[in-house]
């Protein structure tokens, strides 16, 4: 390692906050972020002596004049607040370099992806981006007497800070090339237009009067216009009353709600799930169950996950944007506002905008957004609820144009985005609860975490429904899920009495034990040859979608299901035929209009698709199946049962034999 004597153009000053017991206030420091430095360092004058320890292994550093110096003091796991969020510095070395605290490349990598612009940087914490503004005038506070002056009841005057903005500092660097200053300036220039446009369309207020065109409107209608929905108010704890007071004031300031004289009323309550605990704030929810029963639905269907994933086939680079409280950007007409009236400790209010909780809500924003876009945007952009995904397949230049087009369209329409949630020019991106990574995809880690947080002993049917719901969400990634679910699914029958025993708990434990991770599945490209492999047993059917790419086969999806009671009486050959049909239906969005290959270990299937059935009464079912299959273009390849990878895989991974 060596020292250099000029500021890395890839580094900036940001405000960091340290807090120690016994000190009268937070220690506000100007931290230097330097991707060229391999270490995090701090002055002994900004961290109390008791937090420093002697390093087990002193670090030898070679400086510019060839002299070796030793870093002997280290501070471990130091919390620091940046951009309002709590980060942890794993290891911090003591070194007097003329700045209070330096965040090196190891810190940037820990909270990657690390993105920097001319006026701010982005770290990522718990899969959320944290925006931290750049300080243009930096000071060194850590001088002799600073810590003493900050102690509670201290009579020591606080030393004057030193302006270090223009100073030339010496920083530790690891062997290798640095980011060239000219290259850095080119990168900043390249994104400046997108930065400026994103700034123009972003706001913390979803109906910002300076940016929103407020043209998006919606109507909610009662099935029977004479119906009055009244659900009695709930009781609230003192802490909930305080939280309601804060949130109602915020909503009134945003002008998304107003006091109501409506004859309708639905109760509001607070929820605190994992997401709410992470952000440290409960979420207000209105129980519109009764109102949803009394109102007409919306005919617009949301695209399913497979439809959206099909759109990004072959794409290599992505950007995503979160519409700021997307539903709140859609205004309600006066009659519809009355239907949204809710009660809370502060009184009776109604929404000026579409609230969360209405059954029509999920489709309102994407329908309105989609109707405002021409088909040209659908080639590289899709919308799901209030998330916008932009995707390109030829490189950054094309993607730059696509992103700029969408941002300009948002500005024209007055659609407000959340700046802090924007993800730009990513080869890997989180969307729809999935991690999409250049041709592969798998559920995000929190899906697996939710599964493992369920106790082995389930309390009631509702809790079991939630558990099975998460498994179903991840069904594309779990072979033979139908047979795994079956022992638990039977407990949800309406006429069954709830029971749970030790054997059930053991089964739950084994399910979680076997779900250690989700596989990364291949996302087929348009020119790939597609293959399905199927199998059937007495009660279940299953299949795999594969793709042949550059002479290699990749697994794309799993599918499985149960035969109905009547179907379980079919002959085994018929079950094999039905399994093929079910698997084709499951993967039809990929198989139409492609020519694909069906692999099966059932010899009768090849015979079945080639014979001409007479269509008499006894063969009616087979005739219907044959006619249905005729709409698809496929070849058939028979494989021996011993070579049916899918069947073998199912046998090896089934959980039903564990209990």
Swiss-Prot record:
Substrates-to-products reaction catalysed: DNA(n) + a 2'-deoxyribonucleoside 5'-triphosphate = DNA(n+1) + diphosphate
Name of the protein in its database record: Enzymatic polyprotein
Annotated InterPro entries: DNA/RNA_pol_sf (IPR043502), Pept_A3A (IPR000588), Rev_trsase/Diguanyl_cyclase (IPR043128), RT_dom (IPR000477), RT_RNaseH (IPR041373), Viral_Replic_Matur_Polypro (IPR051320)
Protein function: Encodes for at least two polypeptides: protease (PR) and reverse transcriptase (RT). The protease processes the polyprotein in cis. Reverse transcriptase is multifunctional enzyme that converts the viral RNA genome into dsDNA in viral cytoplasmic capsids. This enzyme displays a DNA polymerase activity that can copy either DNA or RNA templates, and a ribonuclease H (RNase H) activity that cleaves the RNA strand of RNA-DNA heteroduplexes in a partially processive 3'- to 5'-endonucleasic mode.
EC number: 3.4.23.-, 2.7.7.49
Organism: Carnation etched ring virus
Residue numbers annotated as active site: 34
GO molecular function: aspartic-type endopeptidase activity; endonuclease activity; RNA-directed DNA polymerase activity
The Reverse transcriptase domain, residue ranges: 252-436
Protease, as annotated region: 1-180
